[in-house]
Amino acid sequence: YLSRVFQDPKMGTAPRMTVAENLLIAKFRGERRGLFPRRLNHYKEEFQATIDKIGNGLEKHLDTAIEFLSGGQRQALSLLMATLKRPELLLLDEHTAALDPKTSVALMELTDDFVQKDRLTALMITHHMEDALKYGNRLIVMKDGQIIQDLKQEEKAQMTISDYYSLFE
């Protein structure tokens, strides 16, 4: 299946449900869910161990409704939910655009950890050239709705930020 993380931190989660409830929905994506409260209690320790690894304060909020989380915490949770069951394709649609620079860097590092650990195929849409060069292994550059450059790993490795910016001149 396809999984995605949206640009808006408010998308991709159920705001009035808790972190644990959102994770339970993600864990059983595509399956019959039934007896929700019983399953929730069964998986709480697993969910706690999972969010402990994120390290952005989310670990203190397993029983907190999503609407009370920061944008960075919501995006980290959305990413975790999107990758809890290994997707065939992870679509990242400007998923750091609404975040402050420090939170954006932390989320990109978390994204890279998930992609590398689970060997995920990810399509990241971004306007951050530095992220495209650092994390992408293939870059497709578009301008005015047209592909103007398709760079493989080897070609990308030879580029600097200045080279990349010159593609848009």
Kindly give the residue locations of the regions a language model identified:
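Q-loop/switch helix immediately C-terminal to the Walker
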Residues: 17-29
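Conserved ABC nucleotide-binding domain
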Residues: 50-67
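ABC ATPase C-loop
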Residues: 82-83
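Helix N-cap at the start of a conserved alpha-helix in ABC-type nucleotide-binding domains
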Residues: 101-103
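Conserved beta-strand-loop-alpha-helix hinge in the C-terminal portion
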Residues: 146-169
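Helical segment within the ABC ATPase nucleotide-binding domain
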Residues: 105-117
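H-loop/switch region of ABC-family ATPase nucleotide-binding domains
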Residues: 126-127
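Catalytic Walker B motif of ABC-type/P-loop ATPase nucleotide-binding domains
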Residues: 90-93
